[in-house]
Amino acid sequence: MNGTVSRRRTAVRTALASLTATALLAGCGAEVEPSGSGVQKVTVNRCGEPVEYTTPRRAVVYEGGSADKMFALGLTEHVHGYVMPPANPPVTESPWAAEYAKVKFLSDDLLNRELLVEAKADFVVAGWNSGLSDKRGTSPEILDGLGIQSFMHAESCFNYPNHPERHAPFDGLYTDLERLGQIFGVQQRAATVVADMKRRVEAVRAQAPSTRTPVFLYDSGTDQPFTAGRQVPPNDIISFAGGRNIFADLDGRWTQVGWEAVVQARPEVIIILDYQDQPAAQKIRFLKTSPKTKNLPAVVNDRFFVLDYNEGISSPRNVDGLEKFAAYLRDLRS
């Protein structure tokens, strides 16, 4: 699982802005060091490790979830460009399509060190083993040595070997928005965005039935299915909507299981994670024709819910996915 606003201010306004940012950051528990150049330095946790960030000017974002977090906070002018592998749906389908149009498309390949250096990036937003990795020369340590700051999705810190940090998936989303708000000095905006998300989530949870529907998330795979453990957003989407992830007992993120375990759990609903390069229709066709799965209750009753890829990875769109899936479950019960 698989930006720069150069504003001319008077000296007085710059000083006032720095003081305001300092006060806001202090209230969020971050340490800030004002700079006379209009650039702010702030210490924020990165997977449990205190890291000093300087206000980024040329951010590169990897996949839709990273871009959407920046756009949701109104930080488009700080984004130089985006890297979007083939699994991601077209950016024209995003709620932030207009923001994508304002920044550069850099590549449809995996994130790599050469791309970041060529883009003259000073900041990258990605997940551990989803953009950031030792293998591709994009670990935080390597990027630090190149003068490129890195921000890891809190949800992905579960797998980060150096400074692991655990967050429930939706809590990780809120944490990311709050931390990005600190780094870019838009804490109040982040607080407003997070508060609205929490309000929407609680509205869904208030309507969730007490009887939980067993749900299987099908990511990919035919010999062995790839699915969601309890450390990724679909687990919270299923739970908050009134379902029960049949693999919620797996303390992991995206993981392989055996078809025998799926058959034994007898899911009544199957969520299909819809990749651009692995369409949902193709996966549904496999489930309906495979001897291993064609007799599952969800398959027999044609109970498939298609979850957009960017609603399934850590992203502000997780809440959209939750609302849609909750409505689907309510319709099944009506």
Residue ranges and their predicted role:
Residues 44-47, 103-114, 134, 250-259:
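Short helix-initiation/N-cap motifs at beta->coil->alpha
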Residues 65-68, 85-88, 123, 129-133, ...:
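Solvent-exposed loop/turn segments at secondary-structure junctions
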Residues 90, 227-254:
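Alpha-helical, coiled-coil/dimerization segments enriched in small aliphatic residues
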Residues 167-176, 249-250, 269-334:
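Structured C-terminal subdomain patch of bacterial secreted/periplasmic proteins
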Residues 62-63, 67-119, 123, 128-132, ...:
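A short, structured surface patch at a secondary-structure boundary
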Residues 2-21, 26-68, 179-217, 329-334:
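Bacterial Sec-exported substrate-binding components of ABC uptake systems
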Residues 112-123, 141, 146, 257-266:
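Short helices/loops that flank or line small-molecule/ion binding pockets
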Residues 88-89, 130-138, 148-179, 212-233, ...:
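Extracytoplasmic ligand-binding site segments that recognize negatively charged/polar headgroups
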